[in-house]
């Protein structure tokens, strides 16, 4: 191997280590932020609270995130990515309208309560989360729901109704019921999913067809 080849190899290795270090630092900050937001809430949390939960220098935060708002959005974005995966294995495979609605709500409500930290995050931050509903990561959930409804209509699983209205209704019901659900003790995701499903089924036959 010539000197130039060796230099190139060393440069690649250094670059690879730098990228890995960046990824690890970002992941550490996100993990710490999720914990802090769950414990004290978005309003009370500060950048210093987040950095203290890591081994990173205080200035490192700003290499990855502009401010508290941006890292909060990133935390919620990670969660929506996981929700999308679960919906792909839920409502997207439903063969009846009832199964479609139930899968949609069960995935959402179970996701919130399966993780104690995530449950606390939802309990303390629903107002802040509401402000992110138009952000790209969260909008991806709405787009996926619209796509799944269209596919279900095409497959005869759902009647041919207004897709946008139905998606908005489903998303709104999920979010608003989740706020009430997480405030209760004990939290009952199964009951919440059943209530939302029956509510949708009760109105489905009355919706105008297209």
Question: Can you say where each PLM-predicted feature lies in the sequence?
Answer:
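Alpha-helical structural segments
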Residues: 24-35, 39, 53, 70-90, ...
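C-terminal peripheral helix-coil segments that are non-catalytic and often amphipathic
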Residues: 1-16, 110, 114, 143-154, ...
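Basic, helix-initiating cap at the start of DNA-binding domains
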Residues: 1-40, 47-56, 70
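Short, well-structured alpha-helical segments
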Residues: 102, 163-171, 193-197
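Short, hydrophobic secondary-structure boundary micro-motifs
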Residues: 119-123, 131, 161
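Amphipathic alpha-helical packing segments from all-alpha helical-bundle domains
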Residues: 81-84, 130-157, 164-168, 179, ...
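Short hydrophobic/aromatic patch on the recognition helix
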Residues: 54-65
């Amino acid at each position: 191997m010539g000197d130039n080849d060796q230099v190139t190899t060393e440069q690649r290795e250094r670059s690879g280590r730098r990228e890995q270090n960046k990824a690890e630092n970002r992941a550490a900050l996100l993990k710490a932020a999720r914990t802090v937001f769950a414990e004290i809430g978005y309003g009370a949390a500060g950048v210093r609270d987040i950095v203290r939960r890591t081994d990173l220098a205080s200035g490192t935060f700003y290499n990855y995130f502009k401010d508290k708002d941006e890292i909060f959005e990133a935390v919620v974005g990670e969660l929506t990515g996981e929700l999308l995966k679960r919906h792909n294995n839920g409502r997207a495979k439903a063969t009846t309208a009832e199964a479609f609605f139930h899968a949609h709500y069960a995935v959402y409500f179970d996701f919130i309560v399966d993780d104690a930290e995530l449950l606390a995050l939802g309990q303390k931050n629903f107002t802040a989360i509401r402000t992110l509903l138009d952000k790209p990561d969260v909008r991806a959930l709405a787009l996926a729901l619209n796509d799944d409804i269209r596919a279900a209509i095409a497959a005869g699983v759902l009647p041919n109704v207004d897709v946008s209205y139905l998606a908005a209704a489903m998303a709104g019901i999920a979010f608003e019921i989740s706020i009430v659900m997480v405030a209760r003790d004990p939290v009952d995701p199964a009951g919440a999913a059943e209530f939302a499903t029956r509510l949708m089924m009760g109105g489905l036959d009355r919706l105008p067809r297209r």
